[in-house]
């Protein structure tokens, strides 16, 4: 008997301890802010965090490749701008040298190439401009004469020859510059194509590295998740086996009502072991219900008697109230008759007083002449 009780106490203590541990774990899950998992899928959140990290790593690698390409493009643009500035500088230098060598003031012409008749329009150099009104005897040039025609023609031919040579030189220089620009453009295009090919290879290698890293991360994450699921499954199986063992060996499945009796407090029961009330308890409850029923019936009879008394008192009060109202109506009628006779007497007295005033006091009525004597002057 002692051994059986000892085993029962041990099982009960173990069950109580297990229940207390489960309650502590549940409180930790609910009340611990850092590890609260109520209503939250921790696995899904971890997956989202991993996906976000992979996406951020891919974006960082893409931004690094884009930054490298941008730097290379900037270098190429700077080279082109520098080449354009050098070419502009050389052209400006050549123009300045041409102006300094070929367009000096000492080499200027006295006539315009586009106005050959300038000599005809001008005056001879030996003509004095001091004489304001020259006469016919001062004529020095007549129609049909052109003393400097041969010189002027030679000068025009020389000017034409010079202009033609200069145009040929400019065309040759423009052709040379165009060839240089085409060569530079071809070199730049080849350099940009090579750079684009290099950047494409870099991007492809970055993409391959990113895909490899993503595949490795997915494999590692899948392995971790599989291990976690396996551990969770094993823990759940152990918990189920322990629960089955506990249910099969505990007092929960027994039909003995004594297992619900509390050992330290006899007036209390164990809710998880309670199998129902005993016949004595049911009889005591029925007896108590019968006592309550009799008390309720006595209370109902007392309320009924009280209601009857209240009704009779109400009826007597209503009868007395009706009698008082009848007396009040009679008194009001007597008062109205007395008030009417008094008002009639007062009206007769007032009429007699008014007749006396009209016939005796107010006999001398003022005429229009009496009223016209007032306000007849400005004073």
Swiss-Prot record:
Coiled-coil intervals, chain numbering: 85-111, 161-241, 280-304
Intracellular or extracellular location(s): Cytoplasm, Cytoskeleton, Flagellum axoneme
Superkingdom of origin: Eukaryota
One Pfam family cited in the UniProt record for this chain: RIB43A
Biased composition (Basic and acidic residues): 9-21
Keywords (A to Z) from UniProt: Cell projection, Cilium, Coiled coil, Cytoplasm, Cytoskeleton, Flagellum
Keyword set includes 4Fe-4S: no
One of the protein's GO biological processes: flagellated sperm motility
Annotated spans, Disordered: 1-21
InterPro entries: RIB43A (IPR008805)
GO CC annotation, single: sperm flagellum
Subunit architecture: Microtubule inner protein component of sperm flagellar doublet microtubules.
Family: Belongs to the RIB43A family.
Record protein name field: RIB43A-like with coiled-coils protein 1
Protein's organism: Macaca fascicularis (Crab-eating macaque)
